[in-house]
Amino acid sequence: MKINKIFIALLSIFLVLIIGCTNAIKNEGNKIVVEKRVGESDKYEYYNEVKDNKEVQNIKDILNSISWKNAKVDMVSPPHYKFHFEDTTEKQESNGLIYDLWISPDKGRIELIIDSKSKYVHLDKEKSAELFKLITGKNLDEV
């Protein structure tokens, strides 16, 4: 009887630790909708859709490989682009995560924020160029 109580207690602790440590960002959906800022205002218009499964998976892989920082960040200007995942079979946003994307002043890197999760990252040049090309269809150095 005592062994059962110890087993249940250890199992409970283990489950709490596992659940607490799974704070990963889940990118669900098979399409990405991209919006671009209009002028200097905080208004956005439809810009691009990424529907190719391979490209969507590449974007998911990049976003999942990022070491996000837990930080609430206030940027000087509104994001240059916003994007989110959608599931075309459900016709709605999959998880409600909206990624805000800024192009750094040196134009060689991008910064991403997930405001609802208080996540921030400043990507290196290689990942910035790859992600930007996949999302917008343009080279980062051409913007």
What is each residue range found by the language model?
Residues M1-C21:
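Sec-dependent bacterial lipoprotein signal peptides
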Residues I3, C21-V143:
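Function-determining sites in protein domains
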